[in-house]
Amino acid sequence: MAYPNVNKTLMALAKSGIKLGVVSDAPSREAWMRIYYLNLYHYFDVVITFDDTGERKPSEKPFKMSLDSLGLRPEETIMVGDWPERDVVGAKQIGMKTAFARYGDTFGTVNSGADWDLNDIYQLVIIINEENGII
């Protein structure tokens, strides 16, 4: 089961025309099985897995491949992740903004190093609106 407000958040972002992608260290089959099981596949414009890059986060390669596929620059994006040492570090090293998913299993993380810490995924909609001057 997905975390609370995941569908609501992804739907709001997709309706706003926000491009969405997944960067996963999992093999392609495993990543896609999770996405299909959670019925989230229709929200994502790109899914980059270990099979696509041969490198795991925090390597820059999976993040850059995702950005290239989406046609975006790092400063135009926010990466949401639950593992600061891989997700936040990897995204920040190429200039992406970052949000730490505190609503997941944080493994006792106190200081994520992210630009934002999210207690609820729906906070992302508010952050994106603020970043784009909508609110």
Language-model segments: residues:
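Asp-based, Mg2+/Mn2+-dependent phosphohydrolase catalytic module
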Residues: 7, 11-14, 18-135
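A short, well-structured juxtamembrane/interface segment
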Residues: 1-6
